[in-house]
């Protein structure tokens, strides 16, 4: 909020901006954004899908705060779990090689109607499919699941998924 250079007190600016966050992004604004992204991309783009985490170890008043594997502290031999949220992101590279998001969702297994991380990933895949038609989906380890292969085959999409070594 310092970057806005407004004469108002910081707390008032935060309150004003927070009120609008509750409403979310309107469907027309989201659609206009995605149509602009489509203009910036190639005819058959590469869509990268990946999960991340947002860790809130000291949080206790956050809605639906779950337990996530902390990617910053975990190693291949040791997993560290903390309070936080999962983040699923899908992005493309524009014709000028800039990454641009086409899907972003913060989610938690503690949400009321939460089904699974795969459900969120399928939403990202469907978003890319509906926006571009034909694309190549690229995903890292963790997505090497028959459900992913079947979903992408069902939609007639090309894909590259790095497999786990085990």
Name each model feature, range by range.
Residues 1-166:
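Conserved, well-structured functional cores that handle cations and Mg-NTP chemistry
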